[in-house]
Regions:
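Shared catalytic-loop signature of beta/alpha-barrel
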Residues: 1-89, 93
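C-terminal extensions of enzymes
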Residues: 75-120
Length: 120
């Protein structure tokens, strides 16, 4: 489809496509064909944050689609902070990695399963 010029925009969702690496690959393939990328989110605040960071890393990212009802609703119930949307523009979180930090109340739940990886 790309080689035949049948695609005007490529839109994908980080969770559905397979994660950060797969999204970067898809974005690079689209860029090689001068196709702009639009990232989609309707799967939660971590996916939203991943998409924001991907948008910052892709020179061909042009738009980001998310559900305002989720962003202003339950997304903020799960995380300490979500990337700020201001006048149609979004900024990535500051901090290590993606900058994501779950609210303590979710970590303290009796049925929470916490796994820490210390890869070096």
């Amino acid at each position: 489809f790309l080689q035949k010029g049948l695609i005007d925009y490529m839109m994908f969702d980080p969770i559905w496509l397979g994660g950060i690496t797969e999204c970067l690959k898809a974005g690079a393939i689209a860029d090689a064909h001068q196709i702009p990328v639009s990232i989609h989110d309707c799967n939660g605040p971590v996916n939203f944050t991943v998409g924001v960071n991907l948008s910052m890393a892709m020179t061909n990212a042009c738009t980001y689609e998310t559900a305002r009802g989720f962003y202003y609703g339950w997304y903020k119930e799960l995380l300490e902070d979500v990337p700020l949307i201001d006048h149609g523009f979004v900024s990535p979180l500051k901090g290590d990695g993606l900058g994501v930090k779950l609210k303590d109340k979710w970590l303290e739940e009796s049925n929470s399963n916490i796994v820490i990886s210390n890869l070096k």
